Amino acid sequence: MATTLFIDADACPVTREALSIARKSKVSAVLVANATQNLARYAGRAGVEAIEVSGGRDAADFAIVERLSSGDVVVTQDIGLAAMVLGRGAAAITPRGRRYSATTIDMELAVRHAEQRHRRAGGRTKGPSAFEEEDRERFSAVLSSMLSESDPRA
């Protein structure tokens, strides 16, 4: 079973669902975000730790990776953070309920890099589709399954 659920809480649309699932699964949760996210609203909740970081744009990512152990689960939409998480022997899931995979993460990083280069050169790329209730439901089902598995990386 996962020891800890980390939530990259900068603009995470499923924080409430993730915390509820962690509580039901008896897994501790750690919210990590920059100071603009008002994590104080989670103070005092049993099984929830809120960590506010300051500094660069990747400060929350590095704070998560520093605390991560093999078998933990991270909720993030950041492909770079997901790659670091997988490299540390933990599991990662998007807010839309898609598990990141060690077999596809290199391709996802390459696509992200190519799109960044295209945008820097003045090109346009398609953004993500609107977040819908179906995404929220898929996330909840997949995260519940991951937290009940003996090895959430599977």
Show the residue positions of the predicted features.
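Nuclease catalytic cores that cleave nucleic-acid phosphodiester bonds
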Residues: 2-154
